[in-house]
A protein has these predicted regions:
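Short cysteine clusters
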Residues: 103-104, 194-197, 347-353, 357, ...
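ATP/NTP-dependent adenylation/nucleotidyl-transfer catalytic domains that generate, transfer
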Residues: 17, 187-339, 387-388, 393-418
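A short secondary-structure junction signal
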Residues: 139-145, 169-174, 182, 186, ...
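Iron-sulfur cluster-binding cysteine motifs and their immediate structural context
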Residues: 352-368, 380-397
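Immediate flanking context of iron-sulfur cluster ligation sites
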Residues: 177-191, 341, 347, 369
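ATP-dependent adenylation/nucleotidyltransferase module used to activate substrates
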Residues: 1-176, 364, 403-418
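Short linker/helix segments within small regulatory modules
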Residues: 186-189, 363-378
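A broadly conserved sequence feature marking short terminus-proximal activation segments
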Residues: 137, 145-165, 300-355
Length: 418
């Protein structure tokens, strides 16, 4: 408790804007919250629950209980949630996978960042999260420090008060202090995260399905929907889902969700074709530079130079062309330029780019994208691979058409779990 208080005092002097307990409803976060509320004044920190919409039903009971407890103790409790339901995002991104785990960014990280911005009124806030991470949980976590600077989001600190605790110490503390314990654990579950997770062990999946069959099967149905039509028979699809083959997905080749983006080279030009783009490219182009002309051929001034390109719009089809010589001479510009049109094609305004922007330049209110003049062209909204999580999730391997449903995998191991 003393270490928590000393860390709070030290980092408050360093300019941390907001301290908060990253609350998940699990046993570790319940203990962490109890330690923090004993160590710090109740008006000096917040409790933040990232609601993915895929939590165990017992977790929601836990969160409701803790929220009432916080209200009684005058501790600010914040629920952060994506504007999209999991059923909506799974249908647009395809089911998450071990490598392609877009769900954490869309349903957890981005909503939390946006909620803290709203709570603090600061776009580029510095936060410190008290997290219930323990070194004994995994090899990776055994290398964590008590306090570390987050890699995922600039300027966000993590403090791990129970890093050196083992499970026995954790449960002993819970029962000795009469803390609320998520009922998921008493039913045999070792974890209380998302019901269906590509990183979950087979044992975890078994208990989750036994305990919460209705909610679990709803998510499994979403996985089936994403792959229907790809398998020769229902039996093969059943085997694929049951064996966890969906967890091994690395791209969009096997999904029945088609991309509206095509890229090719014709007559020494890079050609990009987008059918029914979801967002306005003239908004996204602002993130890489300043558009200097109002009609095609366009010129964009960037930190890599000034470049000319053409855009044709007809019957819902956007055709972009750029001299192939630029592709070879300005690879850094080309990466960002392609990202602009990846976003144009498939952005659903999931909020990740908005959260990544520390200048508050990206706005996505009421389903409309707007990028204002505070944009510094820092490229933080392009840090996601390929510039867009939807594009990355649905992208086909080179040589496989994104518009063709009939492409099948030749990899006999592609339907098995990692």
């Amino acid at each position: 408790i003393k270490q928590i208080y000393n860390s709070f005092v030290k980092y408050r002097k360093k300019g941390v804007d907001v301290f908060y307990v990253a609350f998940s409803g699990g046993k570790d976060s319940v203990v962490t919250l109890d330690l923090v509320q004993k160590a710090l004044p109740h008006n000096s920190f917040k409790v933040l629950f990232g609601d993915t919409g895929m939590e165990f039903p017992d977790t929601y009971e836990t969160v409701d209980y803790i929220e009432k407890q916080c209200q009684r103790d005058n501790i600010a409790f914040i629920r952060a949630k994506s504007k999209y339901k999991p059923s909506e995002t799974w249908a647009k991104f395809g089911p998450p996978a071990t490598v392609n785990r877009w769900c954490c960014s869309v349903h957890k990280t981005a909503p939390q960042i946006l909620a803290l911005r709203e709570a603090t009124g600061i776009h580029d806030f510095t936060g410190m999260a008290f997290i219930g991470v323990r070194a004994s949980e995994s090899v990776a976590r055994s290398g964590y420090d008590y306090i570390s600077l987050g890699e995922k989001h600039k300027g966000q600190w993590s403090c791990n008060p129970i890093l050196d605790w083992n499970s026995a110490e954790l449960y002993a503390y819970i029962y000795s202090e009469n803390l609320y314990l998520n009922k998921a654990y008493t039913k045999g579950n070792r974890r209380a995260g998302c019901l269906v997770c590509p990183r979950a062990a087979e044992r975890s999946d078994y208990f989750a399905r036994k305990c919460y069959p209705k909610e679990f099967d709803q998510l499994i149905s979403a996985i089936r929907s994403g792959y229907e039509g790809h398998f020769a028979s229902e039996a093969n699809l059943d085997q694929f889902v049951t064996n966890g083959g969906w967890k091994a997905r690395k791209n969009g080749r096997d999904l029945n969700i088609l991309s509206n983006y095509e890229e090719m080279e014709e007559s020494r030009k890079l050609i990009i074709k987008i059918t029914n783009p979801r967002t306005d490219w003239k908004q996204w182009i602002k993130t890489i530079g300043i558009l200097q002309s109002e009609a095609s051929p366009y010129c964009v001034e960037t930190k890599h130079g000034i470049f000319e390109f053409e855009v044709e719009e007809s019957d819902g089809i956007l055709k972009i062309s750029l001299d192939s010589a630029i592709v070879k001479s300005a690879p850094n510009f080309i990466k960002l330029f392609k990202n602009v049109f990846h976003k144009t094609a498939l952005c659903i305004r999931c909020g990740v780019c908005e959260a990544d922007c520390h200048n508050g330049a990206i706005h996505m209110e009421n389903g409309v994208l707007r990028i204002d003049d505070t944009c510094k062209h820092c490229s933080m909204c392009h840090k996601v691979e390929r510039g867009c999580l939807v594009f990355k999730s649905l992208e086909r391997p080179k040589g496989v058409s994104s518009m063709n449903k009939k492409n099948k995998s030749l990899n006999c191991y592609s339907h098995h779990a990692p």
